[in-house]
């Protein structure tokens, strides 16, 4: 643990909280321990696993100065816990806004921030990629990345390497690589040249080796230019072939990829994402590389049994399963707490 960064983050966080109370703070980092805050007058002793947990403890202690407590302890349930910021709808968050969000995350003890940028980041030699959309420069991403590391937060690129690319493919670059208006054409070499450029930009901008490749909701995969040039191929085969090609590029660049999982479910079953039988056997399914992370996203279902079923299915498909829930802010001007 970089204690200089912890000290820097402490000063930034205390300034953000606007605490005027003088505190003497001692922190210890150990493996596999709960977050524990002990108070003796103006002395705080915080024991935890990592900086993100420390900042959560510090924030709690500063916000409860008059409460009658001496020790507070809470277990750590997840090794990685955080949020994804959508920087692809309309425009991106400014760098300063992302920094303010990072400070909020630090107060909550989160250690992962995914930056969802479909094409709102810079790809060298592709001037129309993210044009007029407020795309981040590589230096802006590096600035946010360094700031996040101050608080023990990993900034993770979350991009798109198959679908959801309408705003990129509407430009001339799309003519040689698109299958349909927003989907890349599987198997075309120009596609993988472009994806390697994307991933090289990501590698140069972010300090993490983890990358989210997207690949969700490609409902018309293989049904556009691909169909005219190659004939019909099952979408389950196309998603496996495409993810394998992109996974090889990631290995070449030393990146650890993950993708949204819905195409591997829907392409194999022919049904909807969550319409999977309880006793589903995935042994004869088209599967990704076992080391490719699968992100199970579920923003809708109210029943625990559905989540348990879907997790069982995912564990048959990948050794690395990540869960993504949703804070419902997309159906009105205020959060929908009943659905979150």
Where are these regions (language model features)?
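Catalytic-core regions of glycoside hydrolase
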Residues: 205-207, 220-340
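Residue-level preference for nonpolar/small residues embedded in alpha-helices
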Residues: 2, 6-9, 97, 140, ...
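A generic structural signal for short, non-catalytic loop/turn and secondary-structure boundary residues
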Residues: 18-20, 30, 39, 76-78, ...
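Short acidic, S/G/P-rich loop/turn micro-motifs used as interaction or catalytic elements
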Residues: 2, 33, 91, 300-303
